[in-house]
A protein has these predicted regions:
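Conserved class I S-adenosyl-L-methionine
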Residues: 53-63
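Conserved SAM-binding loop
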Residues: 93-94
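S-adenosyl-L-methionine
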Residues: 1-52
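A short SAM/SAH-binding and catalytic strip from SAM-dependent methyltransferases
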Residues: 120-134
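Conserved SAM-binding motif I beta-strand of class I
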Residues: 79-84
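Conserved SAM-binding strand-loop segment of SAM-dependent methyltransferases
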Residues: 100-112
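Glycine-rich SAM-binding Motif I of class I
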Residues: 65-69
Length: 182
């Protein structure tokens, strides 16, 4: 019983530190704050039939890795790579990786603007328009033909949309998933 109590205290401490450090990271760097993709949106992503065995799926700014860990259960033959540059979020994702032991998931601590994406078949982002503009240039230089880009809520300027999915929840708020194909 003591072990469980200590475990949950440590877990609560890690979650609290993640929130505080994420807020600090946002205030100091001005980078996109860490907000997890809602579970119901992840569920809609899991219905995606374009993801195949052997594909490589990047989550740029993966946070705690919730999206890729959930999708890795559905798409067991796909390799998922999370890229995160916030140390607390990265460490949380690594701890999650240790406990979940998913062989098709890896987490990297690096700036996604410096990540080589030339092997990507799928890329997911939920970031501000300012950062999407930077990524657009990177995508045009690096991505192979046929790569899918999934951008939640923020469209890429001057790039034709392959598909738009209005993700509705029962509440008054929903999301839009913009899908691009390079």
């Amino acid at each position: 019983m003591l072990f469980i109590h200590v475990f949950f205290q440590i877990l609560l401490f890690l979650v609290s530190c993640t929130i505080v450090f994420s807020l600090f990271h946002f205030l100091v760097t001005g980078n996109t704050p860490s907000v997890s993709t809602p579970d119901w949106v992840i569920g809609k992503m899991a219905e995606n039939r374009e993801i195949k065995d052997g594909d490589i799926f990047y989550d740029l700014g993966c946070g705690t890795g919730r999206l890729i860990f959930n999708l890795s259960e559905v798409f067991t033959g796909t390799n998922f790579i999370g890229i995160e540059n916030s140390l607390p979020q990265y460490l949380f994702a690594r701890v999650r990786s240790f406990f979940l032991k998913r062989r098709n998931v890896s987490i990297k601590f690096e700036n996604f603007l410096k990540t080589d994406l030339s092997d990507a078949d799928h890329i997911y982002v939920w970031i501000y328009l300012r950062d999407i503009k930077l990524l657009k240039e990177k995508f045009e230089k690096e991505l192979k033909s046929g790569c899918y880009i999934y951008s939640l809520d923020f469209p890429m300027p001057d790039v034709p949309v392959y598909k738009t999915i209005e993700l509705k929840k029962t509440s008054k708020f929903g999301h839009t998933l913009f899908i691009y194909r390079y």
